[in-house]
A protein has these predicted regions:
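Polybasic/polar functional segments that serve as interface/processing modules
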Residues: 1-115
Length: 115
């Protein structure tokens, strides 16, 4: 993934979004539904109805960037709320994009005794 700029905030848009929206449609949703400025340099995440696709909208200072990801297996973990936003850290964003439950990360392997 492209590195996040220092101080960039990450916002997850709760609920389902029509991912047929592109740059302008998602920027409009950021303004109307989330009451945020899409040109602020913050990242805005949207999830589709099936839960296996997300789009990330981000202003990099020169123009809007739109990133998309589709999981081949599983679904992206999303809040149950149907409206509003959730703030994520960069680490939580990385986990989310890998398909990991960012709300309750767990070890997959417990360390054993060192020999």
């Amino acid at each position: 993934m492209i590195g996040l700029p220092n101080g960039a905030r990450v916002w997850l848009a709760c609920g389902v979004t029509d991912l047929r929206n592109g740059f302008d449609g998602l920027a409009g949703l950021v303004q109307t539904k989330l009451a945020e400025d899409p040109f602020s340099g913050q990242l805005f995440l949207f999830r589709g109805r099936r839960g296996d696709r997300v789009k990330v909208l981000w202003w990099d200072g020169d123009g809007l960037c739109l990133f998309a990801k589709r999981l081949e297996r599983g679904r992206f973990v999303w809040p149950q709320s149907t409206s509003g936003t959730v703030h994520l850290t960069a680490a939580q964003l990385s986990m989310l994009l890998e398909g990991i439950d960012w709300r309750r990360p767990r070890r997959t392997h417990k360390p054993e005794f060192a020999v």
